């Protein structure tokens, strides 16, 4: 493997063993002499550091810009409401009401305000921890309690550890916005699944996402001895590389 590589480990559902695989893969590459970074992008429930003897050295608070209106000079024209695709500004009796939890920090309202009475303030969205554990550089995000949108924090987290030869992204489960943001810019992805009807259904959704993002990917089946053969048949029918099938063992469970 030449050059710097970003590998995303993802899954259509939680509990498939995605984080275990991410940590194991990071440890294997580190043992081969590579400078490896593990980025825990599951910022709502980060737990990758629990598998490492992590020495956290840096904790940084992350902010995102949200609009604020100078109401004394606002004319109530409604341009800000019209330009916002996320309904983060609504006009009530010709006065704009900002809904910060709906805001995607695009800056459209600021740039389009004809009176220039909208400006941005910084809103805390979470923290990012950076440290070292088991010869692996670790960075993980933790979303602030009550903060509804994870993608801005994930985007900030992915700016860490660029000096590593290999960056492994432990993506959040599912196929919603946090998972999509985690997958972006990856050179390849590994989708972890289990051989059950629910596992196959959610795998198909995850496959749709990585194909839409045009990311090369393969499948790992975890606990391959507890279900049926439907995932294997799906991979064959869709011409998807099956990278590994791992049986459920008491040795793995003990870890």
Region spans (language model):
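N-terminal glycine-rich dinucleotide-binding loop that anchors FAD/FMN and/or NAD(P) in oxidoreductases
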Residues: 53-71
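Iron-sulfur cluster-binding cysteine motifs and their immediate structural context
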Residues: 79-97, 108-124
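Short "domain-exit" segments at the C-terminal end of structured domains
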Residues: 251-255
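Walker A (P-loop) phosphate-binding motif
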Residues: 2-30, 36
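C-terminal lobe/tail of nucleotide-utilizing enzymes
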Residues: 207-250
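Short beta-strand-centered segment that lines the nucleotide-binding/catalytic pocket of NTP-utilizing
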Residues: 34-49, 121-127
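Switch II (G3) loop of P-loop NTPases
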Residues: 41-42, 140-179
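Inter-motif core of Ras-like GTPase G domains
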Residues: 176-198, 203
């Amino acid at each position: 493997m030449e050059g710097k590589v970003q590998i995303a480990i993802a899954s259509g559902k939680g509990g498939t063993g995605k984080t275990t695989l991410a940590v194991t893969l990071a440890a294997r590459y580190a043992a081969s002499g590579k400078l490896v970074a593990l980025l825990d992008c599951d910022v709502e429930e980060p737990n990758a550091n629990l598998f490492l003897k992590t020495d956290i050295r840096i904790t940084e608070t992350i902010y995102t810009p949200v609009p604020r209106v100078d109401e004394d000079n606002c004319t109530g024209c409604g341009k800000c409401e019209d330009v916002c695709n996320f309904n983060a500004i609504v006009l009530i009796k010709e006065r704009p009401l900002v809904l910060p939890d709906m805001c995607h920090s695009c800056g459209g309202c600021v740039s389009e305000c004809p009176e220039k009475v909208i400006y941005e303030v910084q809103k805390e969205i979470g923290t990012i921890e950076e440290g070292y554990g088991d010869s692996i550089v670790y960075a993980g995000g933790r979303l602030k309690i009550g903060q509804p949108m994870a993608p801005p924090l994930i985007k900030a987290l992915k700016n860490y550890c660029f000096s590593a030869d290999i960056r492994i992204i432990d993506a959040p489960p599912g196929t919603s916005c946090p998972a999509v943001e985690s997958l972006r810019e990856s050179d390849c992805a590994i989708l972890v699944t289990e051989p059950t009807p629910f596992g196959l259904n959610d795998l198909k959704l995850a496959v749709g996402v990585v194909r839409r993002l045009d990311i090369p990917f393969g499948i790992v089946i975890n606990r391959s001895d507890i279900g049926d053969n439907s995932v294997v048949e799906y991979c064959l029918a869709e011409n998807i590389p099956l990278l590994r099938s791992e049986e459920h063992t008491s040795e793995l469970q003990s870890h």
